[in-house]
A protein has these predicted regions:
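Active-site-proximal beta-alpha core segment in soluble small-molecule metabolic enzymes
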Residues: 7-178
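An N-cap/entry alpha-helix motif that binds or orients negatively charged groups
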Residues: 1-4
Length: 178
């Protein structure tokens, strides 16, 4: 990989096949799970806790409880998930938050997608508040996730996404200390 700390996480919901997951694990990928069943499957094929990310929305208590039992990284989709996670399980030392910058996502003059219409992720104001609340609850390590366009094949997508996320990361550090 271009960065020794980089890990690709495969979206298990795209192809929830244990044989494929086993191959991906052997090749060094992680598993991005969005449900209880996907967490169970990823654990069963041998992914370690650090190799599993749990990203879901409208999350049932049982899903958060299993994610905590497996000690995987939880990626919160909504600011209200903070209190719900604390109520049904506990807040881990490491938490990731999904960011939605809103508006249109464009590369050059082409609009790639409209994240502002998406129901997923936290707004700019919400992610700042989420980091403050999570810090107050003892979180020590933070991640940030964004998904701004589907089926993107241009080479410009990831550098532009990284630019957006790094800009927000700097602001989060300045405003929250996280």
């Amino acid at each position: 990989a271009w960065n020794k700390g980089f890990k690709e996480y495969f979206a298990v919901k795209a192809t929830p096949n244990p044989y494929l997951l086993q191959i991906l694990r052997e090749e060094g990928c992680g598993a991005d799970c969005s449900s209880y069943t996907e967490l169970l499957m990823s654990d069963a094929v041998g992914f370690k806790e650090s190799e599993i990310m749990f990203s879901s929305n409208a999350t049932p208590a049982e899903d958060f409880q299993l994610a905590r039992k497996l000690n995987v990284t939880i990626n919160l989709d909504d600011i209200t998930h903070i209190d719900f996670l604390e109520k049904v399980a506990d807040i881990p030392d490491t938490v990731s938050c999904r960011y939605n910058p809103g508006g249109h996502f464009a590369i050059a003059n082409n609009i790639m997608d409209n994240p502002g219409d998406a129901k997923y992720g936290m707004t700019h104001e919400q992610i700042i508040e989420a980091y403050k609340r999570l810090l107050a609850k003892g979180v020590k390590h933070f991640g940030m996730h964004a998904f701004l366009a589907s089926n993107t094949v241009t080479n410009d997508y990831y550098p532009e996404l990284a630019r957006i996320l790094f800009k927000v990361a700097v602001e989060l550090k300045e405003k929250t200390g996280a």
